[in-house]
Amino acid sequence: MKLYNLKKKQDQVNFSKAVKLGLGKNQGLFFPKELPILTKEQLYKLLKMDFLTRSSKILSMFIGDEIHYSELTKRIKNAFSFTTPKIVSISKNIACFELFHGPTLAFKDFGARFMAQILSFLNHDKNDTITILTATSGDTGAAVAHAFFKMKNVRVIILYPKGKISELQEKLFCTLGENIITIAVNGSFDECQKLVKQAFNDDQLRIETGLNSANSINISRLLAQICYYFEAFALLTKKQQKNLVISVPCGNFGNLTAGLLAKALGLPIKSFIASTNSNDTVPRFLKTGFWKPNNTVSTISNAMDISQPNNWPRVEELFKRKFWSLKTLKYGSVSDILTKKSLKKLAFLGYVSEPHAAVAYYTLKNKLKQNEFGLFLGTAHPAKFKKTIEKILQITLFLPSKLRNQIKLPLLSHNIRPDFSKLKKFLLEK
């Protein structure tokens, strides 16, 4: 598999190199040079397979012979060793696709655990230490931390905006210690992402620390997420499959990119909805044609509090490659007031959700046509937002054992200002 740098297309690497580098020159994202296309017969066979077998087939289409199929299958089995995604009916023509049944109760478990398995394989006969540097607006931190926890020759540094993620999200990854180092940045998530990008642009840091990223900018995480879109389609009836619309809660737009890649492979999804909160750079761009990121605002759907989404260049590249018009991509932005109304509506229908899924549900409900079937993605367990949900819905949420075990542990985070010189010093000395 060859991938090219979106900022310098002559900069081409194989899959293994792309995973190890994370980003190309000039902070460019890697994108597949060739996109496989499934025949109707191949698609039919894939949809009949179980989740793990199908995932192995899909990922081998991209990775090819760089990793032997038997080894890839083993790594996928290790990565996806948890309850498969579920579809829960909400109303006659709407359902939620729950992706939060993994170790850290969020969809990020799929990509983070697959990336950890791939890096472990690529580094198994080497003694070089890899430094995973990543920024999180909520769920990525926990997924990455647990995926790489105690992994040999890997240290993980996670930046997050201080006071701007939920207490339970913070407890899931800032209490581990060992090879997991967490840094609370006195700033926004966009400032955390900027620090990560500056680090990747620093040759000294990259060489001396073996720098890599576990954000959705890493191609291994992105490709892993394609797999659950096929699972969603396979779980539906033929009638539901016919005019399928999927609403994706969007922050960094990696989840949407993966869904669009699944469509590009031949999965017959009618359309996608890019659903954001008040940080609506993309909806405004799709409406006006002008890319004007505003200052990031804090919302109750905090994992989407991102004004400059990293993966948007990949979305644009895919639309160009497939000759799709961006006008066909539906979109919507949802305020906190409407998010709360959406949560209450879902609760009235008998489904307790959380803010990110509620955003996706709101846009889906308002854009779905009579002859269409809609899925919205449930990206995190409601208990991760316990205080918010209990306050809005006036209910008591019980914590899953995974959260109960960590809520009592002390935070081990360091604190810094959003100053790259401070981060660089920390990385070189730690």
Swiss-Prot record:
Q: In which pathway does it act?
A: Amino-acid biosynthesis; L-threonine biosynthesis; L-threonine from L-aspartate: step 5/5
The record's listing under Pfam families reads: PALP, Thr_synth_N
Cofactor dependency = pyridoxal 5'-phosphate
Modification type N6-(pyridoxal phosphate)lysine: residues: K108
**Gene3D superfamilies from the UniProt entry:** 3.40.50.1100, Threonine synthase, N-terminal domain
- In the UniProt record, the gene name given for this protein reads thrC
Which SUPFAM superfamilies did the record assign? Tryptophan synthase beta subunit-like PLP-dependent enzymes
> What protein name applies here?
Threonine synthase
Q: Which GO terms describe its molecular function?
A: pyridoxal phosphate binding; threonine synthase activity
This protein's record includes keyword Metal-binding: no
Catalytic reaction equation(s):
O-phospho-L-homoserine + H2O = L-threonine + phosphate
Q: Which UniProt keywords apply?
A: Amino-acid biosynthesis, Lyase, Pyridoxal phosphate, Threonine biosynthesis
E.C. number: 4.2.3.1
Q: Which InterPro entries does its entry note?
A: Ser/Thr_deHydtase_PyrdxlP-BS (IPR000634), Thr_synth_N (IPR029144), Thr_synth_N_sf (IPR037158), Thr_synthase-like (IPR004450), Threonine_Synthase (IPR051166), TrpB-like_PALP (IPR001926), TrpB-like_PALP_sf (IPR036052)
| Function of the protein | Catalyzes the gamma-elimination of phosphate from L-phosphohomoserine and the beta-addition of water to produce L-threonine.
Tell me the enzyme class. Answer: lyase
Gene Ontology biological process terms from the UniProt entry: threonine biosynthetic process
- Family of the protein in this entry: Belongs to the threonine synthase family.
